Each structure stands twice: as C-alpha cells, then as structure tokens.
C-alpha cells in the first residue's frame, strides 16, 4: 500500500468517526466505544481488502464479513453506506422500528450484512461454516470475523478456533478488536 493510499484511508477513518458521533448523538442511543474501536478494521477490509459488490450483495464468490460484536453495527452501517450498499439517507433511520438499520446487524433487512449478530461468541462458528461451505463449492473467497476482546471469553469461540485448525480453514480470518473494555469494565476487572 502506498503512503498516499494509507493517508486516504486514515482520512476516511476520521470522517467515519465524526459521522458516528454525530449519528449516535442525533438518536441518543448506541454503543460508541465498540463502534469507534473497529473503525480501522472495517475501513481497511471494505476499502482495501475484501472482494464485494454493492450492486450485487449476494454475488457468488464474494468475501464475507461477520461483525460478531454486533453492538458495533453503527460503524458497519456507515462503512456499508459509503461503499454503496444502500443510500446514506437510511442512516437517519438507525434503530427505528421499521428501519433496515437495527441496533444489531440483521441479514434480512440490511444489504451487505452476512449474518444477524447480537449474542456474543457466535460469529466465529458461523464464519467457519461459511468458509467451509465456500471451500466445498470450490470458491476462493475469504470470511472475516470481527470479534470483541470481551466475547473471546465465550467457550464457543475456542471450539470454533480449534475446529478451524483441525479442518484447515485457511480462508477464515478472525480479527480481534482488542480495545480492553467490556460492558461492565476493563478486561482485567471482569475476567
């Protein structure tokens, strides 16, 4: 990656952060910390790494992203809107009853969302299933799972990690958002 491209992505991250604060302030609800801490992760994936097509979100052979830490959905929505999955005007409907943008990602409502998430710890298992299914189909796509550091205390995360190793799921990429904070305090205080 060139320095110019890196600076461009950094500017985009700054814009996403500002937009997130404005968005959550306007609706007076949301999880700003979890969304802010995954800004670089989601920006890098969607604007530099992943093979996706906003005009055809169900495209065969696309890469997949699972936001296992579903409470960070507002940042995902900002990124998806900027990428062109849906009009930016939809962001104003965040967390409204009939909105396509619920408090947690919903695969049935939001273009570009691959899995409905909310309960922590389930994303890596689902991602393993997606990666294995793509391998069986002969596809060269990748599945990226963004997890929070608090959720890796869940046993099912480690079962999925062991299974991924056993079955050689080399197209499954787990990404840990290590921000050091859980809902009730710091990681050191909770665990």
What function would you assign to each model-found segment?
Residues 13-29, 177-178:
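N-terminal capping segment at the start of a domain
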Residues 1-16:
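N-terminal hydrophobic or amphipathic helices/low-complexity stretches enriched
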Residues 20-23, 35-166:
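Cofactor-binding active-site loop characterized by glycine-rich and histidine/acidic residues
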Residues 6, 10, 66-69, 187-190:
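Hydrophobic alpha-helical scaffolding
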Residues 166-190:
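A short, conserved beta-to-alpha structural element at the edge of catalytic cores
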Residues 28-36:
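Structural motif
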Residues 7, 29, 63, 78, ...:
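Short, contiguous strand/loop micro-motifs
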Residues 157-159, 188-191:
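Charged helix-capping and loop-helix junction motifs
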């Amino acid at each position: 990656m060139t320095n110019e491209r890196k600076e461009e992505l950094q500017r985009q991250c700054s814009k996403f952060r500002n937009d997130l604060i404005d968005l959550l302030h306007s609706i007076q609800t949301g999880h700003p910390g979890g969304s802010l801490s995954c800004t670089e992760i989601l920006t890098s994936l969607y604007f530099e790494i992943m093979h996706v097509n906003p005009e055809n979100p169900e495209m065969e052979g696309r890469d997949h992203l699972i936001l296992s830490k579903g409470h960070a959905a507002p940042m995902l929505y900002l990124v998806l809107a900027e990428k062109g999955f849906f009009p930016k005007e939809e962001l104003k409907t965040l967390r409204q009853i009939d909105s396509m943008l619920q408090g947690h990602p919903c695969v049935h409502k939001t273009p570009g969302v691959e899995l409905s998430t909310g309960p922590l710890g389930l994303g890596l298992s689902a991602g393993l299933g997606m990666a294995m299914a793509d391998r069986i189909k002969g596809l060269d796509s990748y599945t990226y799972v963004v997890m929070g550091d608090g959720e890796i205390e869940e046993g099912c995360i480690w079962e999925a990690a062991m299974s991924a190793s056993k079955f050689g799921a080399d197209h499954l990429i787990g990404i840990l958002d290590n921000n050091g904070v859980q809902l009730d305090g710091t990681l050191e205080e909770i665990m």
